[in-house]
């Protein structure tokens, strides 16, 4: 076995081998028992924690969390190596070929089409519907709605003006209000309202994920200010007292540093 104890510094190949040792018979029972689905949530959590490092521009967090993401990639690849379906080298080969294919001018190919046309050709997508259907269903719903609308616009569905998108949001909200008041199932109307809000974001060229994250941060700050202003625990306050405390806090204070850079970019990586 490789001596992992005495090294002062480790490299990529050490990590690859360490994952193999942990998952091998006689290694760590927990690591050896994991499947793609059992650690799926771990993959997502590590990716979001890496994003937290980006948002804070903290190199220590980024270094640690990118390592955790890399560990997840190697772990899943090693599961497939054991299953005999593909290896880490296959993963590297696939992504290299993808990058070379998507940059024909740089790597000596003939004139290429646009970015979306290149991706459609690469993925074997023949229709605009194929392109929309290729958007991952596992994405957060707000993000998925944004991507669907952008791809539909790229296929020829003309983007709406700000006024038109706001009108559709008003219409969707009115349907939601009616469904709620009449005691029906508001699920569809609520979904349409959220989808319409994403259309407004597109018309404004704003990233809905960023906007909602910033709204969450403002909510936390306002709640903290309300709690600090209370003279007793919030649980001991009456509904009227809580309402007064909430309404006296300025929702725009303190001025929060945005969690995310503006991310409205038609040149996507997937």
Place the predicted regions along the sequence by residue.
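Flexible "arm" and connector segments at domain edges
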Residues: 1-65, 71-270
């Amino acid at each position: 076995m490789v001596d992992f104890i005495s090294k002062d510094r480790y490299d990529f190949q050490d990590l690859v081998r360490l994952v193999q040792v942990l998952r091998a018979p006689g290694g760590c029972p927990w690591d050896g028992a994991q499947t793609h689905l059992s650690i799926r949530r771990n993959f997502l959590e590590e990716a979001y924690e890496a994003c937290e490092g980006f948002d804070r521009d903290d190199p220590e967090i980024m270094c640690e969390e990118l390592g955790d993401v890399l560990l997840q990639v190697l772990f899943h690849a090693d599961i497939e190596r054991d299953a005999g379906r593909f290896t880490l080298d296959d993963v590297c080969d696939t992504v290299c070929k993808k990058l070379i294919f998507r940059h024909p001018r740089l790597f000596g190919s003939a004139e290429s089409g646009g970015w979306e046309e290149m991706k459609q050709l690469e993925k074997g997508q023949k229709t605009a519907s194929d392109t929309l259907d290729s958007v991952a269903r596992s994405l957060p719903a707000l993000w998925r709605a944004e991507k669907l609308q952008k791809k539909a616009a790229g296929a020829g569905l003309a983007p709406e003006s700000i006024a038109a998108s706001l009108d559709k949001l008003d219409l969707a909200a009115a349907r939601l209000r009616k469904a709620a008041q009449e005691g029906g199932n508001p699920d569809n109307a609520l979904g349409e309202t959220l989808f319409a809000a994403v259309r407004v974001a597109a018309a404004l060229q704003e990233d809905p994920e960023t906007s909602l994250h910033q709204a969450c941060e403002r909510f936390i700050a306002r709640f903290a200010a309300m709690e600090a202003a209370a003279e007793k625990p919030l649980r001991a306050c009456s509904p009227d007292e809580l309402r007064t405390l909430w309404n006296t806090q300025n929702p725009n204070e303190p001025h929060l540093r945005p969690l995310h850079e503006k991310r409205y970019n038609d040149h996507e990586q997937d």
